[in-house]
Amino acid sequence: MRFSQLYAPTLRENPADAEIPSQALLQRAGFIRKIAAGVYTYLPLARRTLLKIENIVREEMDRIGAQEILMPIIQPAELWIKSGRWDDYGPEMMKLKDRHNRDFTLGPTHEELVTELVKNELNSYKQLPVTLYQIANKYRDEIRPRFGVLRAREFIMKDAYSFHDSWESLDEVYKKFKEAYSRILERIGLRYTVIEASSGAIGGKESHEFVAFAEYGESNILYCDCGYAGSDEKVPYMGEYEVFDEDEKERELVHTPNVRTVEEVAQYLGVEIKRIVKSLIFKGRDGYVMVLVPGNRELNFEKLKAYLGDQSLQMALPENILEDFGVPIGFLGPVGISNVKIVADKGIKYMKNFVVGGMKKNYHYINVNLERDFQVEEWADLVVVNPGEPCPVCGKPLKSERGIELGHIFKLGTKYSETMDVKYMNKDGKMKPFIMGCYGWGISRTLGAIVEQLHDDNGIIWPVSVAPYEVVITVVGKENEKSFAEKLYRYLLDKGVDVLIDDRDVSPGVKFKDADLIGFPLRITIGKSYKDGKVELKERVGNVTIIEADEEVILKNVQHILKR
């Protein structure tokens, strides 16, 4: 390809809406253009890199026996209603109606569709296991699309689904996917970790995330020197709970005008934040639930949804709270509330004489105690675990680092096959629901994650395995230099090198800056040293080699550098 013909409009300044390096660099380097919030067009350079990422993923899927298919983006609502996720999935699901007023969704994932697909095709244990996968666009109506392609509303994903007649068979395939995903990351060249994770809206028995480390990653990874690593959505709290060893005092309702937040209440009443209990109201498929957590701890919403088994759970709106309870948000509490399930974090078991909302505007209760003043229906671990708190494996202090989730694998079990009544005949002639697994990989997220992890002040640093072009030939001389550059370009092409020649009529400075910005792994400069029979090879990370201006010598050096 000739740079003079390449559609790669580079920018000299960062876009105004760019929040993180990858979002800025992919636009500046001419890889993507924003069409709407969370919606991007991938330009030729990005498409080349995406295809290379896809090919690595495809090779690893084929290696473990997965078979590629392609399913429709649009899915009928009946499948999702049947599985129970039409309402559970939440507002991220993009719903629409056709001209006949039938409900559809733009698929955020394909568990329902693939389960229905095999319903009348896989009917005997002799046909199992089977693993199917696709690489296709997905749609999720993110409440706040941000960070460019890392959290987009339309994105490219590889999703795979396996069907089994035993848990042992699922375990075997699950292990193969763990190994395949690790190979994908190693082939691309990213620093990563594998963590225990929450199953979220997908559901299932067990799940793991594959996370690339990045300063601006959305995932907070807690890890330990012993080898343990987990998402902060999943890590259990293993610290000690503070025991309030004191006598119970008489409960009082005190006036707290315009005091709503934990910090304001603590300051107004002159108490420590740890003596306050936060009362949070959520609404799910079974109605309202009140959740209690210590004032000095943060609620882990993913733990709460997993514990209640309700992915539709949402924080109740202030106007609904006022209408249904007659109390403004900020003054809710467990004392005197009725017809609401109360779930509390385990840390509250050991508290005495604490502060809660007074169920009356501008009032709080002090000296509240369990059993005497209210009852908790269920106890659970509901708080966010912080760095420095004990590792659940060895007890040593946890450390933290941010990362970007690229892959997520799940042991679904019979979650979908049972609800959708999809069965096979086992060895004993009995009809049984399939045991399933699902395995996602963010293709377009990988594009952003690579840039997020591998860049410098000058631009992107593409690994050779996924660079849009491995080599750029930069001509900065006159006719003799141009003639040799053309000859070298054709020679390298014939030898299978993925090469671009920068034949534009622009200054050498512009060519060098664009080469660094775009991030080609290797630049061959044919310039002033050519008169002495030399050319310059410069790696993107800085190593410079002056070699003989001979095609075979150059090819040998190029191949050696690209294989390192």
Swiss-Prot record:
<dbReference type="Pfam" id="PF00587">
    <property type="entry name" value="tRNA-synt_2b"/>
</dbReference>
<comment type="subunit">
    <text>Homodimer.</text>
</comment>
<dbReference type="InterPro" id="IPR004154">
    <property type="entry name" value="Anticodon-bd"/>
</dbReference>
<dbReference type="InterPro" id="IPR002316">
    <property type="entry name" value="Pro-tRNA-ligase_IIa"/>
</dbReference>
<dbReference type="InterPro" id="IPR044140">
    <property type="entry name" value="ProRS_anticodon_short"/>
</dbReference>
<dbReference type="InterPro" id="IPR036621">
    <property type="entry name" value="Anticodon-bd_dom_sf"/>
</dbReference>
<protein>
    <recommendedName>
        <fullName>Proline--tRNA ligase</fullName>
        <ecNumber>6.1.1.15</ecNumber>
    </recommendedName>
</protein>
<dbReference type="InterPro" id="IPR007214">
    <property type="entry name" value="YbaK/aa-tRNA-synth-assoc-dom"/>
</dbReference>
<dbReference type="InterPro" id="IPR045864">
    <property type="entry name" value="aa-tRNA-synth_II/BPL/LPL"/>
</dbReference>
<dbReference type="InterPro" id="IPR036754">
    <property type="entry name" value="YbaK/aa-tRNA-synt-asso_dom_sf"/>
</dbReference>
<dbReference type="GO" id="GO:0006433">
    <property type="term" value="P:prolyl-tRNA aminoacylation"/>
</dbReference>
<dbReference type="InterPro" id="IPR004500">
    <property type="entry name" value="Pro-tRNA-synth_IIa_bac-type"/>
</dbReference>
<comment type="function">
    <text>Catalyzes the attachment of proline to tRNA(Pro) in a two-step reaction: proline is first activated by ATP to form Pro-AMP and then transferred to the acceptor end of tRNA(Pro). As ProRS can inadvertently accommodate and process non-cognate amino acids such as alanine and cysteine, to avoid such errors it has two additional distinct editing activities against alanine. One activity is designated as 'pretransfer' editing and involves the tRNA(Pro)-independent hydrolysis of activated Ala-AMP.</text>
</comment>
<dbReference type="GO" id="GO:0005829">
    <property type="term" value="C:cytosol"/>
</dbReference>
<dbReference type="InterPro" id="IPR006195">
    <property type="entry name" value="aa-tRNA-synth_II"/>
</dbReference>
<dbReference type="Pfam" id="PF04073">
    <property type="entry name" value="tRNA_edit"/>
</dbReference>
<keyword id="KW-0648">Protein biosynthesis</keyword>
<dbReference type="InterPro" id="IPR023717">
    <property type="entry name" value="Pro-tRNA-Synthase_IIa_type1"/>
</dbReference>
<comment type="similarity">
    <text>Belongs to the class-II aminoacyl-tRNA synthetase family. ProS type 1 subfamily.</text>
</comment>
<keyword id="KW-0547">Nucleotide-binding</keyword>
<dbReference type="GO" id="GO:0002161">
    <property type="term" value="F:aminoacyl-tRNA deacylase activity"/>
</dbReference>
<dbReference type="InterPro" id="IPR050062">
    <property type="entry name" value="Pro-tRNA_synthetase"/>
</dbReference>
<keyword id="KW-0436">Ligase</keyword>
<dbReference type="Pfam" id="PF03129">
    <property type="entry name" value="HGTP_anticodon"/>
</dbReference>
<keyword id="KW-0963">Cytoplasm</keyword>
<dbReference type="GO" id="GO:0004827">
    <property type="term" value="F:proline-tRNA ligase activity"/>
</dbReference>
<keyword id="KW-0030">Aminoacyl-tRNA synthetase</keyword>
<dbReference type="GO" id="GO:0005524">
    <property type="term" value="F:ATP binding"/>
</dbReference>
<keyword id="KW-0067">ATP-binding</keyword>
<dbReference type="InterPro" id="IPR002314">
    <property type="entry name" value="aa-tRNA-synt_IIb"/>
</dbReference>
<dbReference type="InterPro" id="IPR033730">
    <property type="entry name" value="ProRS_core_prok"/>
</dbReference>
